[in-house]
Amino acid sequence: MNHCELEEVTQHINNKISMIKRLLELRAVAKDPDKRGTLLKIGQEVSAINELLDRFEKYVGKQRDLLKHLKDLEGFFQEDEQDAYHLKNNTPPHMPKRGQQAAPQGGGQVAVQSRQTDAPAAPQEQGPPRKTQRNQIKEMEFITVPEFDSIPPYMKGRVTYDQLNAAVQSINTAVTSKYKILHQPVKTLNNVSRSLQQRFKDQETKDTKGHFFVVEQDIKEFAQLKVDKRFVGMLNMLRHCQRLKEVRGGGLTRFILL
């Protein structure tokens, strides 16, 4: 037995001796009738303190569980916050902004107000007011994420989801610009617009009757977009997603909206 172990044994024996002395003193006090009541009162208070300590221990355990639950909630909130920042910084450009009306589903019909002449309005006494003619222009619906994922990789290449929907927006711009001119009365058009309107009519065939379509020249002029090999690939993807079909004839390829 080394020196440290001997000191520990000595200290333990001394503690036991001190405890025995204290018990003997308390035993002598307990035999005194005057002090026995005080000892009983102290024992009751010690029991009450033990019960209170038990309650505190249970309360601390509940608070510990609550703290763990709050930390878990904090982790969930942090994940939601990160997701919100990700959505804010990666919102597709074709998504409508606050205060803008989203593009309608089921064919994407957009009302276009026909241009009125600068002639002064006739007085109400001369007859009922003339009704304003409204024409509906079809717009291509944007590609959804599941549709984009369904495109074969060999067809998709490096084109991203946002780039494909940007092409959809460009085609819609060309379609809207074309049919705004096409729906105007001839007398309200200038020479340039009149020539364009005649060109649009000459490009129509029996296959395009009742459909909205554009040609490559329309996309170049109205969308200010270069129809290169990459854009042609995106047209193939839109055809795969059943957004358009091609009709050839007369040296032109007509892209008909479905």
Swiss-Prot record:
Disordered, as annotated region: 86-136
GO cellular component: cytoplasm; meiotic spindle; mitotic spindle; outer kinetochore; spindle microtubule
UniProt KW keywords: Cell cycle, Cell division, Centromere, Chromosome, Coiled coil, Cytoplasm, Cytoskeleton, Kinetochore, Microtubule, Mitosis
Coiled coil: 5-25
Top-level taxonomic group: Eukaryota
Annotated segments matching region Microtubule binding: 137-258
Any GO MF annotation of the entry: microtubule binding
Function: Component of the SKA complex, a microtubule plus end-binding complex of the outer kinetochore that stabilizes spindle microtubule-kinetochore attachments, promotes alignment of chromosomes at the mitotic spindle equator (chromosome congression) and assists suppression of the spindle assembly checkpoint. Kinetochores, consisting of a centromere-associated inner segment and a microtubule-contacting outer segment, play a crucial role in chromosome segregation by mediating the physical connection between centromeric DNA and spindle microtubules.
Family: Belongs to the SKA1 family.
Record's protein name: SKA complex subunit 1
UniProt source species: Danio rerio (Zebrafish)
Gene name of this polypeptide: ska1
